[in-house]
Structures are given as structure tokens and as C-alpha cells.
Design a protein with these regions (language model features):
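A conserved ligand/cofactor-binding region detector
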Residues: 1-762
Length: 762
């Protein structure tokens, strides 16, 4: 593997030719399209990863983020291009701002898939992603009257990373057949060969059918199928649309897999020698019955043989402990949309019933619901969790009945992140600091970061203060960016306490907000923090998730109250950034001091935001949940702030079903005061009574994710973190320990384990 040797002069000539004019005369958008074409040419010139066996990573989401800079880093031309533009009076960061972010994902699931594609290519593995080409993604988030509003988020331009291919399939449904078209995005490895992300679309999609906000005719499948990621499923039409959409994804994937295997010489009886399929969460589960259907109906294979073949090809990654996220679909939905799959599913269920006398493991239950995860577990050869605690919980409680049947299938693969995007691209200043001390070997072997934990730095105040200076620079950059793009003013000298992740009650943004109410009331009473605090949220709520939208409303109301209170604003600021996405994350994460990872213990499978923050020198404030457990083990008690009940305590409380939030409310004046503030005159003056009262009642009568039992411990942990922050040398050492121990969370390590234990591509 060799760094790209293209000279600055050669780059200049090629870019000038692509733009049709001198660099200095180009607009930022013209430079972006020119660089995009240059990068695509270079990526196509590189060899693709080869091998008899190929991985197909099927996922409903690929939250890939902007691609220009990441690709230039991987191709080895980033610094040369940056310098070339500067010499011609242009800024690469200004060029980057003109790039639209692909709307192909929502949260951690999609971001993980994107990191994995980067690492698969970097490690030289023969593996492609397969998904859908959503035109509008999830949605673009707006704030109106202190509430979330949604509108389409178009991203596909005439010049884009998408390359239209000749691959097209006829996808059958009950009442019609749709014709697909495959588009490819090149996936560049770091100084290595390339793979592809295959995205299927339809040429009959009609973007104009979207009406007010993001509403559209959910029954007009030929026009709407690939418009949105996760269409609103609060009604029957939306839920059936999900079936149509998922089947479109997997039927295309299955046909592509079989075609490529046959081209390489497979008899299809030996398909497992040519293809391994990673099912990323339950959305692609229908690939199992669809492959069986295609093998039996189009390739004349006997049913038992087809089941055997497919069972040796498919592996399943479980990403959740939440029962609601383990998809279950009524049989009638399949009858209405894809009746050809039902006989296959019934055969699969019948085989399970004849083998096991346990209704909890059946595929089709007594209520005629099809359990998608059950298909994956019975008819795949591997089931993995995504953090050590998560996998243990799957084995011991959530999937215990299956673990007893197939202990050999279960394994753990702790999630990881690509350091190319989340350090090299997002934080070049920190990258240069690290390189100065330990060289650049960490760019390929992240475990080399451990070399940072050396007296040369830890005992050297000058170097520790350089680390603090880098953090201060990133905070100033974030403050400037938010001012320019969102009109938000924050104090760069304050403590940046950040919680960025999709809005869900189990992630407990509501607990963070209650603490901020508590802090606001303390300041009003005269108890002021030594250093001002800026609490930053970034989160989208699913359009039909009412309580999640109420939590956003509460935070935005609190933001307005504090912003207009001259007594409090110098000491406390609450900010909810608009339309949180990868681009914003790349600005927020390097600037963070305290990383909020406060999910209810036992509910977060892993998390990857915690890893990105850690890598950039933030200190984690969190529960012993998900990958926080492994971060805790790596950095030790002194370099993380752990609070709250253990997963064992939480699981036991759920089993006993004896939790009453009102008891905690009555017993703790701080909880009562904070919760009552939600429906106080101040909040009602800027908020909507219906939303605020509904959230108040939800907390007081349900609090399903146990905000109140952890609240006191949470407040104490935050105050300890704020106090420790005042000792700048101590804090710099905490930062350094976190950075030095982050190497374990490289997605290169994760992918190496997937290949060693599951895929066996090498």
C-alpha cells in the first residue's frame, strides 16, 4: 500500500480541466463538483477488492456523511488539495460547506454501517454494502413555536456520488411488479483498494407527491417507495409501506447476490463459498425467505436444500434490547404486499414447531405476528451483539430461550468507529499533536494510541496545556459555526456538556433537561457555577413519537426562558441544534468537554457516540450501559463519571413491576421542584399546555425508563465533573487517558473480528 503520489501540479491541471477554468476563478460549488469528479476518477482507477467469497452488508441505513474530504483522506490527497486551494485564494472548508449530506440514515445503526464500509475497504476485504437510495431520507428538522417540524431533506444533485449502473430487476408484489435500478457509490479504503455501496431505487419515484411537511399518499407505492427512510408507521398504510420497502431492498439484494455468485462459477448449492450476508438489524430479514424462494422457484432447488444453503450464508447483528424494536409484522400485511413469501415463512415456522415445543421461539405466534428476529436466529449461522454487556443480556434474558437452543451461534462484536473520519478529518489539530509524539502508525493501527500515555506528556505541563489549547480552539470553531449557520450564540469559554443522539425516552434526554431545570432554579437562588455551563442537545424525534416530541418541546422552552433571563444566561446556556446530522457531529464532537451517555442501564446496546467523544478527548458522564462498560474498564474510575443503578437492578425492577415514579417525586424535593417546573407559569408562557402537561403526567405516572431513581446520582456525578474541570491539569490528564485508550474502539478492530469469526473472507 502506497500513499498517492500525484503532485500538486498534476492535481491542479486535472482540477482545472474538470472545472473548465482556473481554480481562482471558480465558485466553491464549481470546485466541489470538480473535486467530486476528480475523486470519482481516482477511486475508479484503483483496484477493487477481489476474492471468491464476498460479503454483502445489507442495511436499511447508511449514514455516510459528506464524502469529499473523507475520500480525499483515504486517497492520500487531502493535504495537497487543501494547500492547492489556499494558494489560489480558496478554502477547502468553504468548498465542503456546498456538499449536500446524503440522507440515507438516521442514527447509530446507519453511522455504524458507514464506519464498517470504510473499515472493510481499508482492511482489503471483498465486501459491499446494499441498501436503498432514499430521496428525502428521514426528514429535515425545523423548529417552529418551540416544537419540531419536519420537511423533506433532498440531497441528490445532477452531479453526485451516485453512479447509475445497468443493473435492473423486476420485483414482484401481489398486484404489480416494480422495476429497480442500481446506483453505486465508491467506498475508498485508507491507502487501499475500493468496494461499493449498492443503492437500489425506482425510476418511477415522484418527489412531487409530497404535500405539506412530509405527508404523502402512502398507498401509491410506485411513486413513493424510495422517498423516505422509515415512513411514518403510525397507521396501517405506513406499516404496510415498510413491508413493501424492505422487500424491495432484500429482493434486489438477493438477485444481485445470486447473479454475482453464478458469474463466478457457483452451482448455488455451494453459495456459502461465494457469499456471506450480514443482516444489520431486522429490517433486511426478508432476504432469508426471499433467497429460499428464488432458489426454489427460479433455480429449481428442493426446499430443504434451499433452506440449508441459505442458513449457511446469513448472519444477524442484533442492535437492540428494546422489545418494540424487534420487528413483528401481522401475517395479513404479507398477504397484502408479498403473498409469495408467506408459504416460505410457514415452512420455516413449521420446521421450528416440529423441532421445539416452545411457543416463545416460534416464527409466527398465536396472534398471527411474524417475528423477524426469530427468522434470523433460526436460519442464520451467527447472532452477534454489539457490546459485551449487550451480548450478555441477550444470552441471559432477552434471547435466553434461543441461546439455550443455539449457544454456538451467539458471539459479541463490540462496535467501533472509523478514526479516519472521527479524528483525522474532524480534528486535524489533535491528529497533528498525536503524530508529533507517536508517529502516524495509529492511522492504520489505532491501538498505537496507547503510546500517548507516557510521562513525556502526562508529566509535562506544557504538553498538557497544548491539549487544552486544542480543545479551546475546537470550542471557538464550534461557537463561530453555530453563530453563522444557526444564529446561536454560545460562550466558548464555558464547559461544553453535550448529548447528541436520536430522541428516545431510554436515552433519557428528559433527565438531562430536568437537571438543567434544577440548575436553573439553583442559579435563581444565588448558587452559581464557577465556570459557565453550555448544555448542547442534538436530536430528531420520529414524527409519530409523541412523547419524544414533547421532550424536544420542553428543551426548546427551557432554552428560550434561559436565553431571556439576564440573571441566569451568563452562567447557564441550553442549546438544541437544528437538524442534527453527521456534519454537525463532526463539529460538536471535537469541541465537547463532557460526553452525556445516560441511557437507562441495560437498554443501550452499545452506542458509538461515546467512542467518538472519547477519541476527541471528552470525558464520559454515563451509566454502566452499552460500551460505557468497556470504556470504564479501559480508562479506570478516575477518568469517567459513572452514576445510576446497575443493569441487574434495573432488570430486577422490571421483573418485579413495582416501580412507582410518584414515590420518588414525593420523597425528593429536587425531583418535585424540577418536574413541577415543566407546568409552571414560566414554561406555559412560552410553551404549549397540551404538550407540557402530557410530558408532566408521563413522568409522574409512568417514567418507563426510570429517570427518577437515577436523578440524584446523576446530579452528583455532574457536579463532580464540573468541579474537576476547574483543575485544568487534572482535566487534561483525564482527556489524555481517554484518547490513549480509544484505540480499542476502532472499527478496523471490529471488522477484523467479524471476518475472523463470522465472514472468513481471508
Amino acid at each position: 500500500m502506497v500513499e498517492h503520489t500525484m503532485t500538486k501540479e498534476t492535481l491542479k491541471n486535472r482540477l482545472t480541466a474538470l472545472c473548465g477554468k482556473e481554480i481562482s476563478a471558480c465558485s466553491e460549488k464549481e470546485l466541489y463538483t470538480g473535486l467530486l469528479s476528480l475523486v470519482q476518477e481516482m477511486a475508479k482507477d484503483k483496484e477493487s477488492n477481489q476474492g471468491k467469497k464476498k460479503l454483502y452488508y445489507i442495511s436499511a441505513e447508511f449514514l455516510i456523511g459528506k464524502l469529499l474530504s473523507n475520500n480525499m483522506i483515504n486517497l492520500g490527497i487531502y493535504d495537497t488539495v487543501k494547500n492547492l486551494l489556499e494558494e489560489n485564494g480558496k478554502s477547502l472548508s468553504a468548498v465542503e460547506e456546498t456538499e449536500p449530506e446524503p440522507s440515507l440514515g438516521n442514527g447509530g445503526l446507519g453511522r455504524l454501517a458507514a464506519c464498517f464500509l470504510d473499515s472493510i475497504a481499508t482492511l482489503g476485504l471483498n465486501g459491499d454494502g446494499v441498501g436503498l437510495n432514499y430521496h428525502f431520507g428521514l426528514f429535515k428538522q425545523l423548529f417552529k413555536d418551540n416544537k419540531q417540524a419536519e420537511e423533506p431533506n433532498p440531497w441528490i444533485e445532477n452531479t453526485s456520488w451516485l453512479t447509475k449502473t445497468d443493473v435492473t430487476y423486476k420485483i414482484p408484489y401481489k398486484n404489480f411488479t416494480l422495476t429497480s435500478r442500481m446506483y453505486d457509490i465508491e467506498v475508498t479504503g485508507y491507502n487501499n483498494r475500493t468496494n461499493k455501496l449498492h443503492l437500489f431505487d425506482m425510476e418511477t419515484v415522484d418527489e412531487s407527491i409530497v404535500e405539506d411537511g412530509i405527508s404523502f399518499d402512502k398507498t401509491d407505492i410506485a411513486k413513493n417507495l424510495t422517498l423516505f427512510l422509515y415512513p411514518d408507521d403510525s397507521d396501517k398504510e405506513g406499516r404496510i409501506l415498510r413491508i413493501y420497502q424492505q422487500y424491495f431492498m432484500v429482493s434486489n439484494a438477493a438477485r444481485l447476490i445470486l447473479d454475482e455468485a453464478i458469474t463466478k462459477g457457483s452451482t448455488l448449492y455451494d453459495l456459502a463459498d461465494y457469499a456471506v450476508i450480514q443482516i444489520n438489524d431486522t429490517h433486511p430479514t426478508m432476504v432469508i425467505p426471499e433467497l429460499i424462494r428464488l432458489l426454489t422457484t427460479e433455480h429449481n432447488m428442493e426446499m430443504d436444500d434451499a433452506i440449508e444453503v441459505v442458513s449457511h450464508c446469513c448472519a444477524y447483528t442484533n442492535h437492540t434490547i428494546l422489545a418494540e424494536a424487534l420487528e413483528k409484522w401481522p401475517v395479513e400485511f404479507f398477504k397484502e404486499a408479498v403473498p409469495q413469501l408467506l408459504p416460505i415463512m410457514e415452512v420455516l415456522d413449521d420446521k421450528v414447531r416440529r423441532k421445539f415445543d416452545d411457543p416463545s421461539v416460534y416464527i409466527i405466534d398465536k396472534n398471527d405476528l411474524v417475528h423477524m428476529a426469530h427468522i434470523d436466529i433460526h436460519y442464520g449461522f451467527s447472532v452477534n451483539g454489539v457490546a459485551a454487556l449487550h451480548t450478555d443480556i441477550l444470552k441471559e434474558t432477552e434471547l435466553n430461550n434461543f441461546y439455550k437452543l443455539y449457544p454456538e451461534k451467539f458471539n459479541n462484536k463490540t462496535n467501533g468507529i472509523t478514526f479516519r473520519r472521527w479524528l483525522l478529518h474532524s480534528n486535524p489539530e489533535l491528529t497533528n499533536f498525536i503524530t508529533e509524539f507517536i508517529g502516524d502508525g495509529f492511522k492504520k493501527d489505532a491501538e498505537e494510541l496507547k503510546k500517548l500515555d507516557t510521562p513525556v506528556i502526562t508529566k509535562n505541563l506544557k504538553q498538557l496545556y497544548r491539549l487544552l489549547d486544542i480543545k479551546a480552539q475546537k470550542k471557538a470553531e464550534l461557537a463561530k459555526y453555530l453563530e453563522e449557520t444557526q444564529g446561536i450564540t454560545i460562550n466558548p469559554d464555558s464547559i461544553f456538556d453535550i448529548q447528541i443522539k436520536r430522541l428516545h425516552e431510554y436515552k433519557r434526554q428528559q433527565m438531562n433537561a430536568l437537571y438543567l431545570i434544577h440548575k436553573y432554579l439553583e442559579i435563581k437562588k444565588g448558587k452559581k457555577p464557577t465556570t459557565p455551563i453550555t448544555a448542547i442537545f442534538g436530536a430528531k424525534a420520529a414524527p409519530a413519537y409523541i412523547i419524544a416530541k414533547d421532550i424536544i418541546h420542553m428543551i426548546l422552552c427551557l432554552q428560550q426562558i434561559i436565553d431571556k433571563d439576564p440573571e441566569v444566561k451568563p452562567y447557564l446556556n441550553v442549546v438544541m441544534v437544528n437538524n442534527y446530522n453527521v456534519t454537525l457531529a463532526e463539529k460538536l464532537i471535537p469541541a465537547c468537554d463532557i460526553s452525556e451517555q445516560i441511557s437507562l442501564a441495560s437498554k443501550e446496546a452499545s452506542g458509538t457516540g461515546n467512542m467518538k467523544f472519547m477519541l476527541n478527548g471528552a470525558v464520559t458522564l454515563g451509566t454502566d450501559d452499552g460500551a460505557n462498560v468497556e470504556i470504564h474498564e479501559l480508562v479506570g474510575d478516575d477518568n469517567i463519571y459513572i452514576f445510576g443503578d446497575s443493569s441487574e437492578t434495573v432488570i430486577e425492577r422490571y421483573k418485579k413491576a413495582n416501580y412507582c415514579s410518584k414515590d420518588y417525586y414525593d420523597a425528593d424535593p429536587a425531583i418535585k421542584e424540577a418536574v413541577d417546573f415543566i407546568i409552571s407559569k414560566k414554561m406555559l408562557a412560552v410553551g404549549d399546555k397540551e404538550n407540557l402537561e402530557r410530558l408532566y403526567k408521563e413522568l409522574l405516572t409512568k417514567d418507563w425508563f426510570m429517570t427518577f431513581p437515577d436523578f440524584k446520582s446523576y446530579c452528583e456525578a455532574k457536579e463532580k465533573a464540573f468541579a474537576d474541570y476547574e483543575d485544568r491539569t487534572l482535566w487534561a490528564r483525564k482527556m489524555l487517558v481517554n484518547i490513549s485508550q480509544a484505540g480499542y474502539f476502532s472499527s478496523d478492530r471490529t471488522i477484523g473480528e467479524y471476518d475472523r469469526d463470522i465472514w472468513k473472507l481471508r
